[in-house]
Amino acid sequence: MKKLVQFLLPALLFSHAAFSQEKTFPVDGQVIDAKSGQPLNGASVFCQNTTVGTLSKEDGSFHLRLANGGYDLIISYTGYETQTIRIGKDHRPADSLRVQLKEQDKSLEQAVVTGSTEVADGWAKYGQFFLDNFIGTTPNAAQCVLENKDVLKFYFYKKRNKLRVKATDMLVITNNALGYKIKYQLDSFVYYYDGNVGSYTGYPLFEVLQGSPDQEATWKQNRLYSYSGSRLHFIRSLYDSTLDEEGFVLELADSGSNRFKKVEDPYNAQLYARDSGDVEISVQGRLRVSYTSQAPDKKYLIENKYPLTTGVQISALDIVNGFVIEENGYFYDQADVVNIGYWSWKKLAELLPYDYLPQQ
């Protein structure tokens, strides 16, 4: 077990009051076959990156109740294309959702792997590499267990010097450091060796583990440690206009140069606009985020050859065209925002669900 930093930030514990209120909204719907119109029994329906999910009933119906905020609702069924629907308190259908799933086109799947070779001993050759770039190399990652590595398939594209990893079923990861079991529907994992650039996308569903009182206390401390300075912590602080109190400092890259200039007022009308329950951030380019309330993990400093005396966590976001934040810390469009620096080092092993609250 990694050594814990023994601290509790009062501002952190009592921040984000809007999200901590017990306000919820319902989501009802039915999952059917797009071609026949027949209901699909047992379809997986969940809000990605949360602990909230269910299975459709015999008539295809489902019901969820969600805390106010934004979510990506994921609907999947074996042999069918997964569907994603963005929902929230202020943008959801007035009536019940009717989700029509299409059967997967096997010919398209075959075309995807054309020009590649499935590696027969893929796990032996690339397994640890995959874990390092998917789960991470943090101290918490050492306490994560991939329960079903047999569902992974590894493909190597010689002409492009690219590795692609597929999963034939949801990955199951037990995070013994944070006390979660994660079911992860892997959408894409690719790594380009020529540029040493990789990325992965997918849909995680969290299940809170049950443990002894000592385990529960340890998990609570570890979750707080992972949350402090995280992207989720930053996004919520930006939403709440509490960046300074929470220990965040922002700098924006000057266009055409690598120089950064401190953002003196992150809430000015040119950058920050509140509309009903949403906050729109109008930033393009690279935004550097420093977290001054907690030092980086020593393992990160050693791996990246930074001085061990470094006392500030430095991350950055490459932003295509701004983004919109909802009160639980969900934001969109997430595909247009890329992590750099400390946040990019903290991968799945540090991930917390949107329904996590520091005071829990």
Model-derived regions, located:
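Bacterial Sec-dependent N-terminal signal peptides
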Residues: M1-D28
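Short, ordered, surface-exposed loop/turn motifs in non-cytosolic proteins
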Residues: F25-V27, A34-N49
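A short, amphipathic beta-strand motif
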Residues: V27-D33, G60-F62, V99, A111
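Hydrophobic beta-strand segments
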Residues: A43-C47, L73, V113
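A short, solvent-exposed loop/turn motif at the edges and junctions
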Residues: C47, I74-R86
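Short, acidic Ser/Thr/Gly-rich low-complexity loop/linker segments typical of extracellular
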Residues: T50-S61
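Structured interaction patches on ligand/partner-binding surfaces of diverse proteins
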Residues: T54, E81-L97
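Surface-exposed, low-complexity/disordered segments
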Residues: L97-Q360
